[in-house]
C-alpha cells in the first residue's frame, strides 16, 4: 500500500534536511539516515531539539566498503536523492544490490536523479551534461550525470525492477521507483 509508509531508510542523507521534512509531514514515520560517521554527527547537531528529531536515527556506513553493512531492517521505502550519480556504474550496481538486502517484498527503492536525457528543455540537458564534465575533470573524477538507460541498467543488474518512472519533478528531476 503506497499510503502506509512508516519506516524509511535515507541513504546519503547528509544533513538530515529531507528526513526532518518526512517526520514533520507524518507523526508516525521513522527515518534512518545512512551516511558516513562524521556526516551523521553533523546531522545530529542540525536536527537536535527539533520536533520529530527523536524519530530520526543514524546508521554509520562507508558506502564504498562492501563489508560496511546496511541496516538489516525491512524498510517501506529506501530513498536515494542525487546520490548515485556520485559513483561509477559498478559502484551503483553494488550499492543497489546492498540496498535490496534491506528490502522486504513490499519495500520500494526510490532513486531521484537529474538525467540529461529526461529534461524538458534542451538547455537544461546541456547544463546537466556540463555538470558531468565538471565532476569528471575537476571534482572527484568519478561522478557524472547519467543517461537514464545507464542508471536503469545498473539498477536491474542489481536484481531490482523498475516499477514506475516519474519525470519532470521540480526543475528536472526523475524518480525511479524500484522493487525486488
Predicted regions and their residues:
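Alpha-helical subdomain
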Residues: 2, 9-180
Amino acid at each position: 500500500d503506497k499510503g502506509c509508509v512508516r519506516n524509511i531508510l535515507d541513504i546519503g542523507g547528509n544533513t538530515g534536511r529531507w528526513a526532518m521534512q518526512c517526520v514533520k509531514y507524518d507523526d508516525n514515520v521513522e527515518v534512518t539516515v545512512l551516511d558516513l560517521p562524521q556526516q551523521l554527527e553533523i546531522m545530529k547537531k542540525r536536527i537536535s531539539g527539533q520536533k520529530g528529531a527523536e524519530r530520526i536515527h543514524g546508521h554509520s556506513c562507508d558506502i564504498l566498503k562492501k563489508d560496511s553493512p546496511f541496516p538489516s531492517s525491512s524498510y517501506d521505502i529506501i530513498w536515494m536523492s542525487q546520490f548515485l550519480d556520485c559513483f561509477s556504474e559498478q559502484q551503483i550496481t553494488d550499492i543497489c544490490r546492498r540496498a535490496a538486502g534491506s528490502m522486504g517484498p513490499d519495500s520500494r527503492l526510490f532513486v531521484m536523479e537529474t538525467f540529461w536525457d529526461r529534461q524538458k528543455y534542451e538547455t537544461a540537458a546541456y547544463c546537466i551534461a556540463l555538470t558531468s564534465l565538471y565532476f569528471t575533470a575537476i571534482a572527484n573524477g568519478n561522478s557524472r550525470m547519467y543517461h537514464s538507460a545507464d542508471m536503469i541498467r545498473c539498477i536491474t543488474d542489481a536484481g531490482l525492477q523498475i516499477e514506475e518512472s516519474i519525470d519532470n519533478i521540480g526543475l528536472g528531476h526523475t524518480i525511479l521507483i524500484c522493487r525486488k
